[in-house]
Amino acid sequence: MKMELKVKPIENGTVIDHISGSKALKVYKILNIEEKLPITLALNVPSKKGVMKDILKIEGLELTRDDVNKIALISPDATINIIKEGIVIKKFKVNLPKRIDGIIKCTNPNCITNKENIEGKFSIEQKNTLKIRCEYCEKFINSIIISK
């Protein structure tokens, strides 16, 4: 007998779908979600496209633009669903902007942003294979450190 697990839909909040497989915990961590909020986390769920995906449902959370940008850095194919009174009122794919300020930390120890209290500014040079350049020291970074 095939068993299915049913997850109760959320009433008001956000569903982050199509998160790259095994990256939902990283998304959860960078969003600094209040511990009191009800959260449903599904890892490595088969998608209709035949690839594994993760899903994160957060009751009572509205994402900021910075939150969406952080998600796009981790999982560029993610989809955001905004839920009000049990109905999807808005659905969109995350999209990396051309520039990101303040949410990434430069990995160059000699960068001015790491020596002084200066907010990082980065240009997205390539989206498909993520290539990000610090606007202060010009270093290309390949491991992203999200600022809190």
From Swiss-Prot:
Classification via PANTHER family: ASPARTATE CARBAMOYLTRANSFERASE REGULATORY CHAIN
Superkingdom of this protein's organism: Archaea
Any one biological process term the GO annotation gives: pyrimidine nucleotide biosynthetic process
Gene Ontology MF terms in the entry: metal ion binding
Homology family: Belongs to the PyrI family.
Descriptive protein name: Aspartate carbamoyltransferase regulatory chain
Organism classification: Archaea, Methanobacteriati, Methanobacteriota, Methanomada group, Methanococci
GO (cellular component) term, any one: aspartate carbamoyltransferase complex
Task performed by this protein: Involved in allosteric regulation of aspartate carbamoyltransferase.
InterPro entries, alphabetized: Asp_carbamoyltransf_reg_N, Asp_carbamoylTrfase_reg, Asp_carbamoyltrfase_reg_C, Asp_carbatrfase_reg_C_sf, Asp_carbatrfase_reg_N_sf
HAMAP family: Asp_carb_tr_reg
Alphabetical UniProt keywords: Metal-binding, Pyrimidine biosynthesis, Zinc
Species annotation: Methanococcus maripaludis (strain C6 / ATCC BAA-1332)
Cofactor binding note from Swiss-Prot or TrEMBL: Binds 1 zinc ion per subunit.
Residues annotated as binding Zn(2+): 106, 111, 134, 137
